[in-house]
């Protein structure tokens, strides 16, 4: 809902694109800060407590940008919204790890698929309310009320929390993040940077590099996001059969191939195929990384997920920002080979998702299937 109202709020506050771009960095900074703080609280009080609390915070903060009167108040509103969004993100993913543990099979990608579907639904509803002439305060306020009510009503259905008070089995407080988690976080940065590039530059690629009309160019993001949603609906079955390593390895490889096809294509139809292949390939990568991080240590689910999600989110923010300056030294389509290389690296190092054989603190309630694809 917030994304749909960006142009209207930007005009109402009276800031230009340049200033608004800087203000959006506060949204990202708040999200990363919220993710890191949420990880500690989740390990102390459990995801069952943090999910509804963070959902209420995020929902209530949704109306704040619509109430902003200048750049300063908009920046403060975006910072608070970012904290709420980041806190909710880690809380939901941590609880999804608990759900996987109960089912004893992969379900993380399904959660991410419903997130994508929710974004589509919110965009449609937001567009409709704008068409009715609703002000941002009214439509975002209604969305905030809906979010708070949904958080309260669904809270009893959440699984009992695994509060660990941030300690290991031996009672010692955990102060260091394992190297394996940081490696997963680095892979999340690479994959989510590639997603960010597709989200923000695929439409501009068709318009500026292939001279497509604005209406036709919009299909680039549509092809990418649709393929990603469908891929996430199927990724859990693939992970259950072939294992998470195969999902990340061959998914990242397909993502690299799709991005390369889009970058090198001289025609709009083949470029759309490339963006769709990229979306399908990348669809299951991030869920597998989040799941593996959460299952690494039952005493630090929140902390580990927050590290991977936080660094991944930085990649999502950095990717689009890096492409812009690169266009001053090379054509736009050639800049896409940066995410191509990163996806190739992710594919080559996917073995990090394998369960360490000598790791007494590693708990994987979702048994990894034999990796028939390597």
Where are these regions (language model features)?
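Intracellular juxtamembrane helix-capping segments at the cytosolic ends
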Residues: 87-101, 284-297
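Short amphipathic helix-loop junctions that connect adjacent transmembrane helices
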Residues: 3-18, 200-216
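Short hydrophobic/small-residue motifs within alpha-helical transmembrane segments
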Residues: 28-29, 116-121, 225-230, 313-315
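Helix-breaking motifs and short loop linkers at transmembrane-helix boundaries and internal kinks
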Residues: 14, 46, 67-72, 211, ...
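Conserved MFS/SLC helix-loop-helix module at the cytosolic interface between two early adjacent transmembrane helices
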Residues: 33-72
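Helix-to-loop junctions at the C-terminal end of transmembrane segments
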Residues: 34-46, 130, 231-244, 327-328
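Symmetry-related core transmembrane helices of the 12-TM Major Facilitator Superfamily/SLC fold
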Residues: 137-156, 336-352
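Paired small-residue
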Residues: 61, 72-81, 258, 269-277
